[in-house]
């Protein structure tokens, strides 16, 4: 079930251009859609976030570096670890301009929070999951590196008890999901660039996104792959 509406453009823009943008800013953007945030009593070990992480009804929007080059990210495999239940083994690929690189790594979910919604929904419970990621571009090719940072997922428990991707507020201006923010460090030069990607929005991307209700790239970045 989804709810579609547009909040003021000023609200999301002020969050997007605030410097520096932090993981806390992302959390506040999502939780602003809800009445209350509180500790979650569910067990991370008993929850399987694979269907949330592999949700493919929408593609990632991502950017890298000071010029906000378009970053394409695709997960091809995610498996919950049998011995460490908060850890997920990840495989996928990235593309910047014409360079496509395979990666493998991990996502670790370490915190759950429950979100209280006053709207009528089909969910027993809604919340966010927070964690860390580390992805290694492992091929013997130029322009490879290490991605690392933090991840934020919006989830929901259905009335049937299933853990689902939460798109209830899709269409709301501040909404995004499956957000990753952090750095990419070149293996060749050891130089680090800021990186971020998510569904529907590019988190912490400054003036890249000028859209209200949907992502629209700023014209000055079109030459960087947008």
PLM feature spans:
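Active-site/pore-lining binding-face segments in mid-to-C-terminal subdomains
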Residues: 13, 169-172, 181
């Amino acid at each position: 079930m989804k709810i579609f509406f547009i909040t003021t453009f000023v609200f999301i823009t002020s969050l997007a251009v605030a410097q520096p943008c932090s993981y806390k800013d992302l959390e506040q953007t999502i939780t602003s859609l809800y009445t209350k945030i509180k500790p979650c009593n569910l067990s991370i070990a008993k929850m399987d976030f694979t269907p949330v992480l592999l949700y493919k009804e929408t593609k990632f929007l991502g950017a890298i570096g000071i010029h906000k080059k378009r970053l394409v990210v695709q997960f091809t495999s995610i498996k919950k670890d049998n011995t460490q239940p908060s850890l997920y083994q990840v495989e996928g690929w990235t593309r910047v301009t014409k360079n496509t690189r395979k990666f493998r790594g991990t996502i670790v979910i370490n915190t759950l929070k429950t979100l209280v919604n006053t709207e009528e929904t089909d969910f027993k419970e809604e919340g966010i999951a927070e964690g860390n990621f580390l992805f290694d571009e492992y091929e013997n090719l130029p322009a490879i590196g290490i991605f690392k940072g933090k991840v934020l997922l919006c989830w929901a428990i259905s009335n049937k008890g299933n853990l689902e991707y939460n798109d209830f507020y899709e269409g709301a201006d501040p909404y995004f999901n499956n957000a990753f923010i952090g750095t990419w460090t070149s293996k060749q030069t050891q130089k680090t660039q800021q990186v971020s990607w998510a569904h529907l929005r590019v988190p912490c991307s400054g003036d890249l996104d000028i859209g209200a209700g949907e992502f629209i790239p700023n014209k000055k970045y079109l030459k960087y792959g947008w």
